[in-house]
């Protein structure tokens, strides 16, 4: 069994601030009340930091998956943009958080299996 499955180590609806942050950064639009970008980034990094490093990439993937169902995308936004930006959230210039790869890095979120 994969212990990074949503509902175990990863919450069922993970990283709410990161979802908003991804949309703001990748699409330039806001969902819900407009929170200043640095505040949103801080909240997102804090949510990610609470997760074990092994499951951080998987949590980002789960957050994106949950957005794909029942989520209205604006014409200015593309899943491609979100998929490209999402894995960079753990990187040095963003949250700088270690992952299962032992450094601040996630593979492209569509590229790995469910263990990431």
UniProtKB/Swiss-Prot annotation:
Q: Enumerate the UniProt keywords alphabetically.
A: Alpha-amylase inhibitor, Disulfide bond, Secreted
* SMART domains reported for this sequence: AAI (SM00499)
- One Pfam family named in its UniProt record: Tryp_alpha_amyl
Q: Which cysteines are joined by disulfide bonds?
A: 4-55, 18-44, 27-77, 45-95, 57-106
Give the CC-aspect GO terms: extracellular region
Q: Does the record carry Disulfide bond as a key word?
A: yes
**PROSITE patterns documented for this protein:** CEREAL_TRYP_AMYL_INH
The entry lists its GO molecular-function terms as: alpha-amylase inhibitor activity; serine-type endopeptidase inhibitor activity
Q: Which domain of life is it from?
A: Eukaryota
What is the first-listed, main subcellular location in coarse terms? secreted
Location(s), subcellular: Secreted
Is Protein transport among this UniProt entry's keywords?
Answer: no
Q: Which InterPro entries match?
A: Allergen/soft/tryp_amyl_inhib (IPR006106), Allergen/tryp_amyl_inhib_CS (IPR006105), Bifun_inhib/LTP/seed_sf (IPR036312), Bifunc_inhib/LTP/seed_store (IPR016140)
Q: Which family does it belong to?
A: Belongs to the protease inhibitor I6 (cereal trypsin/alpha-amylase inhibitor) family.
According to its UniProt entry, the function of this protein is described as: Alpha-amylase inhibitor.
- Protein name, entry field: Alpha-amylase inhibitor 5
């Amino acid at each position: 069994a994969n212990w990074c499955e949503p509902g175990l180590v990863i919450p069922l609806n993970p990283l709410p601030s990161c979802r908003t942050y991804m949309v703001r950064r990748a699409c330039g639009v806001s969902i819900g009340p407009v929170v200043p970008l640095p505040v949103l980034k801080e909240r997102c990094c804090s949510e990610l930091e609470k997760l074990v490093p092994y499951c951080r990439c998987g949590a980002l993937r789960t957050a994106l998956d949950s957005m794909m169902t029942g989520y209205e995308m604006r014409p200015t936004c593309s899943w491609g943009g979100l998929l490209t930006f999402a894995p960079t959230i753990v990187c040095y210039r963003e949250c700088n958080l270690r992952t299962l790869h032992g450094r601040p890095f996630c593979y492209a979120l569509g590229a790995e299996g469910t263990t990431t």
